[in-house]
Amino acid sequence: MNEAIKITNLKKSYDKTIALKGIDISIKDGAFFGLLGPNGAGKTTTINILTGLVNKDSGETKVFNKDTEKDFRFTRSQIGISAQEFSQDWFFSLEKLLYFQAGYFGIRKKDAESKVNELFDKLGLNEKRNSRLRQLSGGMKRRFQIAKALVHDPKIIILDEPTAGVDVELRHE
């Protein structure tokens, strides 16, 4: 089986604070993988480097054997991320935001319609599709983050603190 993610000797510092000190990770295609550690251990920094949101100091990061910096568009097309922080798109409805997210990946509204409807249904967001993010509870915002991560059918799903703010019943679902 091919490697979906390969990280070799990854290093990152913020001023004099070392965030990542030569980490190595190999994740096979189709595998479930958890990155665990205390606050400040570098989990989110690793995710942000992998998705191109933060520049690494050194090391190698690959997605399906393609360099994440050289093949940024490919990398972004393969990864869906539900970030730890909520997006700040307060002015548009959830439905519009999901269509915008699909458009970011080159999916036309007409082509995205069935996927958007499916995600609203599966994540229990149908009644909220015309709501604004500012009107949602933390758990509902988290569900919407997951919908955004899935709208372009990525091969890799990254969930950064996916159960924060989610009630116990939904965690089991």
Each model region followed by its residue ranges:
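Hydrophobic anchor residue at the start of the ABC signature
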Residues: I146
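Conserved ABC ATPase "signature" region
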Residues: Y99, G103, K110-K128
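Conserved ABC ATPase signature
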Residues: R132-L136
